[in-house]
């Protein structure tokens, strides 16, 4: 997945406002070697053991110490200028704690993706919830959000 998706993150990153950091959560595949040999501009934080999904992210966020952290799974591609509006919104709205971009389906980019209920709204506590999904149907992206 790294070879398929990470290039879009590297190519579409604005290095004036963000570093690309891959956190390896104790993987047993060759992810660390791929990052070191094929993605020289990417920073690598490698844990010796797998701390699980939430604890792995939390440890990385604490250790990296950035003002903002943006979490992407390894199966996410991004488009040009995806990051700037999120950053600008956070900078201009200090009372906002979380933002997310529009998330589209990888198999059909005219539809939203709702993996884990993301792709909709985030409530005041930072929990994502769906908008535009009714049971077994998924809303088409017509630029409405």
Regions inferred by a protein language model and the residue ranges of each:
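Short, well-formed alpha-helical segments that are part of the catalytic scaffolds
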Residues: 1-13
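A conserved acidic beta->alpha catalytic loop
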Residues: 8, 24-33, 49
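Short beta-strand/loop segment that forms part of the nucleotide-sugar
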Residues: 17-26, 45-47
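Glycine-rich, basic loop-to-helix element that forms the pyrophosphate-binding segment
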Residues: 46-64
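Short aromatic/hydrophobic "clamp" motif used to bind/position activated sugar donors
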Residues: 69
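The conserved acidic donor/metal-binding loop of glycosyltransferases
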Residues: 73-77
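Conserved donor NDP-sugar-binding/catalytic core segment of glycosyltransferases
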Residues: 79-115, 120-123, 127
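Short, flexible, basic/aromatic active-site loop/helix in glycosyltransferases
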Residues: 120-145
């Amino acid at each position: 997945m790294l070879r398929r998706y990470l290039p879009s993150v590297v190519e579409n990153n604005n290095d004036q406002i963000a570093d690309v950091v891959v956190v390896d959560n104790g993987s047993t595949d060759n992810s660390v070697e791929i990052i070191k040999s094929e993605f020289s501009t990417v920073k690598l934080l490698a844990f010796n053991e797998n701390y699980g999904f939430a604890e792995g992210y939390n440890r990385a966020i604490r250790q990296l110490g950035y003002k903002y952290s943006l979490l992407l799974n390894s199966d996410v591609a991004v488009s040009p200028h995806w990051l700037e509006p999120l950053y600008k919104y956070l900078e201009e709205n200090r009372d906002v704690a979380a933002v997310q971009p529009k998330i589209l389906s990888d198999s059909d980019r005219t539809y939203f993706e709702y993996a884990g209920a993301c792709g909709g709204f985030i409530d005041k506590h930072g929990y994502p919830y769906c908008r535009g999904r009714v049971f077994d149907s998924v809303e088409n992206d017509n630029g409405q959000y």
